[in-house]
């Protein structure tokens, strides 16, 4: 594809991420984590049908499996979006003003794993709380006042 191109004499371009788009927003992680929280609530609210009602038990199992699968997928996406922010957007200079930044992201990534492994309303809410703090820090670094909100 690049066989006929000449790269001699060109300067090396350096970017802060894999693709230098510069488009970052913790809202992506929030949406995914909010889905995890809502699915956790739905799973906890599911009522197991009475014994002997095979059709209802099958529907219950199907719904439970679907909710768990989607919850795990959304937790992995939240983790991905958090890691992109952590490794591509935030720089060493941000640590001067936010010395707990690495710990916040590390704990958030661990919470993404925890909410995949278990059905914990506490951990799902803790993940949302951490992402809210990341949201606040992120927008402070951009000098913008962007209010936190949730879709549900």
Walk through the language-model features, giving the residues of each.
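Short, charged low-complexity intrinsically disordered segments located at boundaries
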Residues: 73-83, 137-145
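Short, mixed-charge, low-aromatic patches
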Residues: 61-68, 86-88
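N-terminal intrinsically disordered, cationic/polar leader segments
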Residues: 1-65, 99-128, 133, 137-152
């Amino acid at each position: 594809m690049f066989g006929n191109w000449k790269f001699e004499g060109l300067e090396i371009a350096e970017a802060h991420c894999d693709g230098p788009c510069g488009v970052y927003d913790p809202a992506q992680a929030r949406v995914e984590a909010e889905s995890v929280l809502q699915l956790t609530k739905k799973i906890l609210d599911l009522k197991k049908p009475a014994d002997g009602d095979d059709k209802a038990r099958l529907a219950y199992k199907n719904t439970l499996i679907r909710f768990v699968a989607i919850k795990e997928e959304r937790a992995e996406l939240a983790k991905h979006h958090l890691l992109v922010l952590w490794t591509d957007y935030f720089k060493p200079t941000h640590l001067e003003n936010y010395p707990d930044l690495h710990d916040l992201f590390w704990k958030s990534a661990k919470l993404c794993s925890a909410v995949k492994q278990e059905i914990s309303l506490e951990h799902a809410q803790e993940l949302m709380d951490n992402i809210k703090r990341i949201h606040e820090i992120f927008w402070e670094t951009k000098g913008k006042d962007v209010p936190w909100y949730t879709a549900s």
